[in-house]
């Protein structure tokens, strides 16, 4: 009698095990299918980005968008556009923004430029490695300049797991709105060069 009840009990658990196995297989199949689909979309996005960058980088520079054009500035139409802007650098507002590049850890050095009409455009003056001299001692440049470079869209909200901390002068993203508010600058372009 024990043999019959043991046999019946193991058969009752088999459908449950099969159902659980099927559910797990379906879950993993769906997850991997979703991840694969996401990778294909991401590849398409990256290839489109590379095409946009390559077509814009080597183009002759155009005048950077002025205030009336700022509402139309968008990542898909303006980012990496070769631009030029004229004005006076405001070195007293130069800010270090943490950067990690293929060259190692360091800082981007951002300085606002004031156009003749009063508009402000932040200029990324380049990368300075951590072990280099204090970037805040960079020579104060005076006079009118023409800057040529690539238009980049502001990077809001800090970096992954790190929020900008203006009170302690810790910047993790090139957030032109936050940089401008911290320095009480008005009429600031929503991009940097």
Indicate residue ranges for each PLM-predicted region.
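Surface-exposed, charge/polar-rich loops and edge strands
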Residues: 2-76, 80-193
């Amino acid at each position: 009698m024990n043999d019959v009840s043991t046999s019946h009990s193991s058969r009752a658990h088999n459908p449950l095990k099969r159902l659980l196995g099927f559910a797990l297989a379906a879950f993993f199949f769906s997850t991997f299918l979703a991840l694969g689909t996401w990778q294909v979309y991401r590849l398409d996005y990256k290839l489109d980005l590379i095409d946009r960058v390559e077509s814009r980088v080597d183009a002759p520079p155009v005048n950077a968008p002025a205030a009336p054009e700022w509402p139309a500035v968008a990542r898909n139409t303006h980012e990496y556009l070769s631009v030029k802007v004229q004005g006076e650098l405001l070195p007293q507002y130069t800010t270090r923004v943490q950067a990690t590049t293929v060259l190692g850890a360091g800082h981007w050095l951002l300085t606002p430029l004031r156009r003749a009409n009063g508009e402000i455009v932040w200029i990324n003056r380049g990368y300075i490695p951590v072990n280099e001299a204090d970037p805040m001692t960079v020579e104060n440049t005076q006079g009118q300049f023409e800057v040529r470079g690539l238009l980049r869209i502001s990077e809001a909200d800090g970096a992954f797991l790190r929020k900008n901390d203006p009170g302690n002068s810790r910047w993790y993203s090139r957030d032109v709105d936050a940089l401008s508010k911290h320095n009480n600058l008005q009429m600031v372009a929503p991009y940097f060069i």
